[in-house]
Amino acid sequence: MKRTRAGFTLLEMLVAIAIFASLALMAQQVTNGVTRVNSAVADHDQKLNLMQQTMSFLTHDLTQMMPRPVRGDQGQREPALLAGAGVLASESEGMRFVRGGVVNPLMRLPRSNLLTVGYRIHDGYLERLAWPLTDAAGSVKPTMQKLIPADSLRLQFYDGTRWQESWSSVQAIPVAVRMTLHSPQWGEIERIWLLRGPQ
């Protein structure tokens, strides 16, 4: 009488284990790849959101620039737009100005709709500074917000006929501002904002 086989041989078991092990290894590699891609996408998404937030701040602030000179801490008159190398202790160029359009619903808060804002390069980042006061703002500590990593900032101002490297008018604001920002993440970024000037 012939005996029939009632199971797998050792060789068949080893081949099956090898196949399942290779399938498990491939599945793990696919999972690791998807995790790495998701992490890279999330990191890039975070950087892109920060860039969009930075451009949004700049756009809202610059397009609301007011031709309003300010009074310094000692009562001295300062220009409506203060810009140049070292302004606000910037490691590159910086700028400070008064903007309007700050929301004060039903005038319930004891403040105006004006805000003094500034931008500078500090510790490798573009920073936005905001003072609640328009006059003698130096006597109040500003709120600072780190924006995108940046190592240089260059500003130019359009007076209606030509671009200038500096702005010297005490009361008037330029027609447009050109900003060239160098960021290690994004390279060179150039943007032009049309303002309310000349006024």
UniProtKB/Swiss-Prot annotation:
<dbReference type="InterPro" id="IPR045584">
    <property type="entry name" value="Pilin-like"/>
</dbReference>
<dbReference type="InterPro" id="IPR010055">
    <property type="entry name" value="T2SS_protein-GspJ"/>
</dbReference>
<protein>
    <recommendedName>
        <fullName>Type II secretion system protein J</fullName>
    </recommendedName>
</protein>
<comment type="subunit">
    <text>Type II secretion is composed of four main components: the outer membrane complex, the inner membrane complex, the cytoplasmic secretion ATPase and the periplasm-spanning pseudopilus. Interacts with core component GspG. Interacts with pseudopilins GspI and GspK.</text>
</comment>
<keyword id="KW-0997">Cell inner membrane</keyword>
<keyword id="KW-0812">Transmembrane</keyword>
<feature type="propeptide" description="Leader sequence">
    <location>
        <begin position="1"/>
        <end position="7"/>
    </location>
</feature>
<dbReference type="Pfam" id="PF11612">
    <property type="entry name" value="T2SSJ"/>
</dbReference>
<feature type="modified residue" description="N-methylphenylalanine">
    <location>
        <position position="8"/>
    </location>
</feature>
<keyword id="KW-0472">Membrane</keyword>
<dbReference type="InterPro" id="IPR012902">
    <property type="entry name" value="N_methyl_site"/>
</dbReference>
<comment type="similarity">
    <text>Belongs to the GSP J family.</text>
</comment>
<comment type="function">
    <text>Component of the type II secretion system required for the energy-dependent secretion of extracellular factors such as proteases and toxins from the periplasm. Part of the pseudopilus tip complex that is critical for the recognition and binding of secretion substrates.</text>
</comment>
<keyword id="KW-1003">Cell membrane</keyword>
<keyword id="KW-1133">Transmembrane helix</keyword>
<keyword id="KW-0488">Methylation</keyword>
<dbReference type="InterPro" id="IPR051621">
    <property type="entry name" value="T2SS_protein_J"/>
</dbReference>
<feature type="transmembrane region" description="Helical">
    <location>
        <begin position="8"/>
        <end position="27"/>
    </location>
</feature>
<dbReference type="GO" id="GO:0015628">
    <property type="term" value="P:protein secretion by the type II secretion system"/>
</dbReference>
<dbReference type="GO" id="GO:0005886">
    <property type="term" value="C:plasma membrane"/>
</dbReference>
<dbReference type="GO" id="GO:0015627">
    <property type="term" value="C:type II protein secretion system complex"/>
</dbReference>
<dbReference type="Pfam" id="PF07963">
    <property type="entry name" value="N_methyl"/>
</dbReference>
